[in-house]
């Protein structure tokens, strides 16, 4: 079960990724985490990435694809994986396909921009575990405390309105075209594509995902 989640920042991907990972026992692969661990481990790819980053350059698509290929060979990916934050552009999606990384499901979370802004501004996180809450839509049992540990919740630096609006503009320009790309891939039977109404309750969306993925 190899899954890509698409949708603007704040569309609810993180919450549902957590649900999918727990229910189906597949790892969530974040390109940011992969880069950091490859650099830390001093692997050949990690050293190449570090050299680029040290010179203030962006890590190339080829290098990220190579990291993804290396990561999905690991034992925890034998039943599949969930890709987080990649691909972001059509060239990246093409490169992934050319590298033989096939995807079973593309799930697109659709939410209007104004609701996304409301969602992100109210978001609270438990940094050590990555658990995500919302003061209105998905509140913790005790205000501003993590349900599991009871530790204080925090606000991400990126969760301020001006930054959110900039990220939405970037998403619509860069990543939104992937929706039609994967719809065409699904028509050609290369993958299965599902549009998810992300404005509903967390539990309703999780239920729909279960029906799709079971």
Swiss-Prot record:
Entry keywords, A to Z: ATP-binding, Cytoplasm, Kinase, Nucleotide biosynthesis, Nucleotide-binding, Transferase
Enzyme class: transferase
EC annotation from Swiss-Prot or TrEMBL: 2.7.4.3
Binding site for AMP: 31, 36, 57-59, 85-88, 92, 156, 167
Gene Ontology biological-process entries: AMP salvage
Subcellular location: Cytoplasm
Residue segments, region LID: 122-159
Region NMP, residue ranges: 30-59
Pathway entry: Purine metabolism; AMP biosynthesis via salvage pathway; AMP from ADP: step 1/1
Chief subcellular location: cytoplasm
Pfam families: ADK (PF00406), ADK_lid (PF05191)
Binding-site residues for ATP, renumbered to this chain: 10-15, 123, 132-133, 200
Superkingdom: Bacteria
Reaction catalysed by this enzyme: AMP + ATP = 2 ADP
Listed GO CC annotations: cytoplasm
Any one GO molecular-function label of the UniProt entry: adenylate kinase activity
SUPFAM superfamilies: P-loop containing nucleoside triphosphate hydrolases
Notes concerning its domains: Consists of three domains, a large central CORE domain and two small peripheral domains, NMPbind and LID, which undergo movements during catalysis. The LID domain closes over the site of phosphoryl transfer upon ATP binding. Assembling and dissambling the active center during each catalytic cycle provides an effective means to prevent ATP hydrolysis.
Functional note: Catalyzes the reversible transfer of the terminal phosphate group between ATP and AMP. Plays an important role in cellular energy homeostasis and in adenine nucleotide metabolism.
Assembly, per entry: Monomer.
Matching PANTHER family: NUCLEOTIDE KINASE
Family designation: Belongs to the adenylate kinase family.
Protein name according to UniProt: Adenylate kinase
This protein's encoding gene: adk
